[in-house]
Amino acid sequence: MSGAQRRKTGCWTCRLRRKKCNEDGQPCSNCEARGVFCHGYGPKPSWKDRGEREREEAQRLQLISRARTRRARATPTNSINGEPRRPSIDMNTSDMGSPIQMGLGSSDSSIFETSSLDLLDIPELGSSLWEPTLDIIQVQPPPSDAPSALQFPSILGDGLEEKEIDLIMYYVVEVFPRQHSSYQGTSVMERSWLLCVLKRSSSFYYTSLSLSAHYRLMSMPEGGQGRTALLQEYERYKTCSLFRFQELVSSATRPQSPISTGVVGESVICGVQIAMLEAVSKNMQSSYLHLSSAALSLAQLLDNTSTLDSSSISTNTTPPSSVLTTDLYHAGSMEYKALRCFSIILIWNDILHCSAQQTIPAAAKTYQKLLADESFIPLFADIVGCEGWVLVPILEAMLLASWKKDQEAKGQLSIRELLTKVDHIESILGDRMKRLAPAVLRQKEAGISSQSPEQIRLVHTYIFAHASFVHLHTVVSGAQPSVPEIRQSIDKSLAAWQLLPPSLINFKTMAWPFCVCGSMAVGSQRELFQKIMSENFQNQSTSSNLHCLKSVVEECWKNFDKRVPEQSPSSYNWKVVMEKLNLSILFI
């Protein structure tokens, strides 16, 4: 076989790069030695399309590999000096495939040679996917001064600067609302905290530029004018965002407190932002690794602040333990608004994704503490379009499933103890449902046309609550649609689905309950779910998300209908089916 031929064995990364793979684990030794992300040996990745997405992934791996080679050859004698500069990228560099020197003077160029650009692929983290820790991110010490911050010049005499301003405005006005369609800060002024973080965090700045460039690319036709140049800009901004985030995370290994950075909770905010960037690029494994890193940063942030003497805390440096609540003392701070927003996005996605993956979130204990705070959970409604308490029974059911599996493995499962735990979770749901049910019934009587945004969020919460009932009893009884509690909860969930106007159904918010209940539907229940899907396929903004969910639900139906008595219910469990189809609901 010639070296130019595509290899048919080995990990997906080596096959893409046409390298010999030793197939000796994940990451394989070849990927580990070159410092690139190992995509493993599982089902064909979503980027493997023999087209543009495959070329983009190859280019991304090439950028990282070349950066590592440059670093190995470098003499680490230079340092960064001078005032912080506006982050910008030299778009005139002749080496289009190598990491660029972004917004740096001649004395700054060594940072791309003395530090690793590999962090965001985190090959070391890939080998311990379900038990990530910040300690395993091994990087060289970053430059001694603070990273560049966005400066607003008085004269726009620079074409590159105008490009960046255009992309930043596109992010604030178009991309952020598209990514977070449930966020209730609908006007640009209500999103002014974004500019604050963009100005103070270079990692957030470059990641936002990358996201903006990505969505611009998605709106351009194949072969459109300027597409190639924009793709190169996207790759360069992304490379810089990875480097800046590497600096940020590596600072956590230093003796000083990891929260004493330029922005409160910066590693949380930027970790979530980069996870979203990887998700829209369909690098789902990398996205989850960064989400896990952000979760650990959040846990570390809260653990550190809880031990500090509140009398010595400065509002500009170290936040108190109430940093994520509605404490009026901090409500007006733009940095705290950003931290609350991205922490909620993190918790929401991490819990639901881990539920789909049948794993326990790395920061589960931190989430439990936050979700027990009645001043914190109301914040979810305005950010994700659903009340935050619905995550409590979901997380508790995940912990129950883990406990049950462990007890069964030991041969020590007590049915009485199992039922006691189930009763506790049901009581959480029951107490909340007593408040929800009358309000939803009034909406049913009033009709769809009279619903306000607050009423829509109430219906979302009601649907989630009944999906949680189904989820809980699936843990106890397996994926069995005939179980009375499962069948009844699906019926009540469907009644609420029909209260939502098709144009207002947000499948980014509702992906989890749709899969939980839709996958277990039988008979007339399926007809109603099919109606929901067909009505929403007319809405092009949700069709790609819905296509993923539709594939999972219909595969579950097919497997259930052709089941045999001795067949395991796992064949029509939506979580198992989603894994086999290589799909994800993370940042869907």
Curated annotation (Swiss-Prot):
Q: What happens when the gene is disrupted?
A: Impairs the production of ustiloxin B and its intermediate ustiloxin F.
Presence of the UniProt keyword Transcription regulation in the record: yes
Example of a GO cellular component annotation carried by this entry: nucleus
Q: Which Pfam families match?
A: Fungal_trans_2, Zn_clus
Checking CDD domains in the record gives: GAL4 (cd00067)
Annotated region Disordered: the residues are: 68-92
Q: Which domain of life is it from?
A: Eukaryota
- What job does the chain carry out? Transcription factor that regulates the expression of the gene cluster that mediates the biosynthesis of ustiloxin B, an antimitotic tetrapeptide.
Q: Which residues bind DNA?
A: 11-38
Q: Which InterPro entries match?
A: Fun_TF, Zn2-C6_fun-type_DNA-bd_sf, Zn2Cys6_DnaBD
SUPFAM superfamilies in the cross-refs: Zn2/Cys6 DNA-binding domain
Descriptive protein name: ustiloxin B cluster transcription factor ustR
What is the gene name?
ustR
